[in-house]
Design a protein with these regions (language model features):
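Bacterial N-terminal signal peptides that target proteins for export
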Residues: 2-10
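Bacterial N-terminal signal peptides
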Residues: 10-20
C-alpha cells in the first residue's frame, strides 16, 4: 500500500470517529468486530501454479499465511459511519489488503472511500515451440521435402516470473444542496498504479524469422477526476457526468539493436547485405512502448416517468482520447504529436406495459467513432524521403437496436422474447461491414415452493464478421516438372518477383476467429426444501462457427456445475461447488515460412 493511500485512510478514519467531536462525545450506537487467523499451506502442483492462481489469494509455495478483518460501525442522530479493513499477509510479492469507509452526515453529504492492493501473475511464453532450420552453420535443408519449423526463437529471461502489483484508491462524495431541492452534486477522485514486470516479445533483425522475448518494466499510473450532478423534479430525472483521465507510463521501454546483416550461411559465400538493407541504425531501438494518454468524456441522461408506468430515457455521450506520439530521429517522423479518437454516442429506451401480463422494452444506440489521419515520413539513406499517408482503421459507425417482451404466464412463471440487430459500418473497405441478428428466448418459473427452473436460449446470425482480409494462401506452381524437387512461386505477368510482390500481394484467403453462427443454451434449477438448505444444478452449452473463404472456425463449450449451501443451527454456513469446463477450438492459422 502506498503512502498516499495510507495518509488518506488515516485522515478519513480520524474524520469519521473524531469529527465532529461533540457528536461522538455523547452516547452513540457503536459496534464492531475483529477476526484474525493464520494458516499453514502446502502447495503441490504438476505444472505452473500460476495457471490456477492468476489472481493469487494464497501463497505460491509452502509457508504460513495470516489474515485479519476489522469492522466498525457508529451512528448518532443523523451521522453514521462504517469502516471495513481486510488484510492478508504472506503472499508472494506483497500483502493483499482492502479498506472501505462510508460516512453519512445528515444525508446532506455522503462520502465513500475504498482502496485495494492485489497481485496479478502474467503469462510467460517460453517460445520453445519455435525452432530454425538454418540458425547455425551446416548444410542446407530442402524446405519442400523436410518440413521442419523455420523460425528461430530466444527467451532471454527463461526463469523469470512476471507479476503486476495493482493498487487502486477511489474517493467519492455526494452533496445534496438544501437551496436546490432534488439536486445532488457528485465529485470523485481515483488513482490506479500498476508496477512490476511483463513479457515483451519482438521480431529481431530484418523479418519475422527470429522471435525474442525479454522482461519489460511496468510502472503505470492512472488518475481520474470526476464531477457531475443529478436532478430529480417529479417524474423528470436529469443526470450529467464529467471524466478527466490521465495515464502515464513512467518506466522505460525495452530496446534492441539490429544485427549486422550478413549473407546466408554455408554453402553460400559469406558477405554483407548492405545493399538490401531497408535502413541501418547503429543505436538501440525501443519497442513495445506504451504511450501516455489523456481522456475526457461528457455524458448526459434524461429520464421521464409517465403516469401509466411507462418510462422514456434518452442519453448522449461525447468522449475524446489523445495518445502521445513521437517519431524516432534519423528513422521516421510524424506530422502530429498526438493522435485523437472521438466518440459520439446517442441512446434511447422506451418501456411500457401492455395489459396486465406483458412489458415491452424498446431501445436503440448509435455510435460514431473517428480516429485521426496522419503522415509518416521515413528518413532516406539516399535519395528522397519515403512518405506514407495513413487513415485510422478504427473509424466506424455502429447501430444497435433491441426489442424485449416479458410475458407473465402464471404466478411465478414468465417467458421473455428478445430480438437484437447490430450493424457496424467501417470506413476501410478491406475490413468489411458487419451485420448481426440475435434472437433470444428465456423461461423462468417456480414449479413448486421448493423448486425453480431457469432456461435461456440465444441464436446469433452474423454476416461478414471482422476478419483479416487476404491474409493467407499464396497460389503455388511447380515449374520444375515431375523431375523437380521444389515447389516455387511464379511471377504474374509484369510483376517483379520480389518477396512482397510475389507472396504478400498474392494472398487470397481471409482469416478470422469471429463466428458467423452462434447457438448458446443455459439451464439451471434450484431446490430449496428449507431455509437452511439449497442446491443448484446448472449447465451452459455454446457452439459457434464460421465458413469464410477457404477457412473454417469452430468452437464448442460445455460447462456444467453444481453448488450446495447449508446452514447449521450453530450459525455455521457451509458452501460447496463444482464446476467443469470443456472447450474445443478448431481454426486454421497462417504460419510464416522464412528460410535463411
Amino acid at each position: 500500500m502506498n503512502t498516499q493511500s495510507k495518509i488518506w485512510l488515516l485522515l478519513a478514519a480520524l474524520l469519521t470517529f473524531l469529527v465532529p467531536a461533540t457528536v461522538w462525545a455523547e452516547e452513540a450506537d457503536f459496534s464492531g468486530s475483529f477476526e484474525a487467523g493464520v494458516s499453514a499451506l502446502s502447495i503441490s502442483d504438476s505444472d505452473d501454479v500460476k495457471r490456477v492462481n492468476e489472481y493469487p489469494t494464497i501463497r505460491e509455495d509452502d509457508g504460513i499465511q495470516g489474515y485479519g478483518k476489522v469492522k466498525l460501525e457508529a451512528a448518532k442522530g443523523g451521522v453514521a459511519a462504517d469502516l471495513d479493513l481486510n488484510y492478508q499477509g504472506g503472499n508472494s510479492r506483497t500483502d493483499i489488503q482492502s479498506q472501505e469507509l462510508n460516512l453519512d452526515l445528515n444525508r446532506l453529504i455522503r462520502i465513500h472511500s475504498e482502496s485495494e492492493t492485489m497481485e496479478h501473475w502474467g503469462d510467460h511464453d517460453t517460445l520453445d515451440y519455435l525452432n530454425a532450420t538454418m540458425k547455425g552453420s551446416g548444410t542446407t535443408t530442402n524446405t519442400a521435402t523436410d518440413k521442419q519449423p523455420a523460425i528461430a526463437s530466444d527467451d532471454l529471461t527463461p526463469e523469470e516470473d512476471f507479476m503486476i502489483i495493482r493498487r487502486e484508491m477511489k474517493n467519492e462524495a455526494d452533496i445534496a444542496l438544501p437551496q436546490l431541492p432534488g439536486v445532488t452534486l457528485h465529485v470523485g477522485y481515483r488513482t490506479e498504479e500498476r508496477e512490476g514486470t511483463e513479457q515483451a516479445i519482438t521480431l529481431s533483425k530484418c523479418a519475422a524469422c527470429h522471435v525474442v522475448g525479454e522482461s519489460k518494466q511496468i510502472n503505470e499510473k492512472t488518475e481520474d477526476l470526476t464531477a457531475g450532478l443529478t436532478g430529480k423534479f417529479g417524474g423528470l430525472t436529469i443526470e450529467y457526468d464529467y471524466l478527466n483521465r490521465l495515464f502515464e507510463e513512467q518506466a522505460a521501454a525495452p530496446t534492441y539493436r539490429v544485427d549486422v546483416a550478413n549473407a546466408p550461411d554455408l554453402p553460400y559465400p559469406t558477405g554483407n547485405f548492405d545493399g538490401r538493407l531497408l535502413y541501418d541504425y547503429p543505436d538501440e531501438l525501443a519497442y513495445n512502448e506504451t504511450p501516455d494518454s489523456q481522456k475526457q468524456s461528457h455524458s448526459a441522461k434524461v429520464r421521464v416517468d409517465m403516469v401509466n408506468g411507462s418510462e422514456l430515457v434518452g442519453s448522449y455521450v461525447y468522449a475524446e482520447a489523445k495518445s502521445d506520439k513521437a517519431g524516432d530521429p534519423d528513422i521516421y517522423s510524424l506530422n502530429v504529436n498526438e493522435l485523437t479518437s472521438e466518440l459520439n454516442a446517442y441512446g434511447a429506451k422506451f418501456k411500457t406495459r401492455l395489459g396486465k401480463s406483458m412489458i415491452l422494452t424498446l431501445s436503440g444506440k448509435v455510435q460514431e467513432i473517428a480516429g485521426d489521419d496522419f503522415t509518416l515520413t521515413y528518413e532516406a539513406v539516399s535519395g528522397a524521403n519515403y512518405v506514407q499517408n495513413f487513415s485510422s482503421e478504427e473509424t466506424r459507425d455502429e447501430l444497435d437496436l433491441k426489442a424485449d417482451l416479458l410475458i407473465r404466464l402464471a404466478k411465478g412463471q414468465t417467458v421473455r422474447l428478445g430480438y437484437e440487430y447490430e450493424e457496424i459500418d467501417r470506413e476501410h473497405n478491406d475490413l468489411g461491414d458487419t451485420e448481426a441478428s440475435i434472437y433470444k428466448l428465456a423461461y423462468n418459473g417456480r414449479l413448486s415452493k421448493a423448486l425453480s427452473v431457469r432456461v435461456k436460449y440465444q441464436y446469433e446470425d452474423i454476416e461478414d464478421p471482422f476478419r483479416n482480409h487476404n491474409a493467407a494462401n499464396v497460389p503455388l506452381t511447380d515449374v520444375n516438372g515431375s523431375a523437380g524437387t521444389g515447389v516455387v512461386i511464379t511471377a504474374a505477368s509484369g510483376v517483379d518477383l520480389r518477396y512482397g510482390d510475389a507472396f504478400y500481394d498474392r494472398r487470397e484467403d481471409d482469416l478470422t476467429n469471429m463466428p458467423e453462427e452462434v447457438h448458446e443454451a443455459k439451464v439451471s434449477t434450484t431446490w430449496s426444501p428449507s431455509s437452511q438448505f439449497s442446491t443448484t444444478l446448472y449447465a451452459r452449452v455454446r457452439q459457434e462457427s464460421n465458413d469464410v473463404i477457404n477457412n473454417s472456425y469452430e468452437q464448442s463449450v460445455f460447462a456444467p456445475g453444481a453448488s450446495m449451501w447449508f446452514a447449521t443451527t450453530g450459525g455455521l454456513n457451509l458452501t460447496m461447488a463444482y464446476n467443469f469446463n470443456k472447450e474445443e477450438t478448431e481454426n486454421k492459422m497462417c504460419v510464416g515460412w522464412y528460410h535463411g
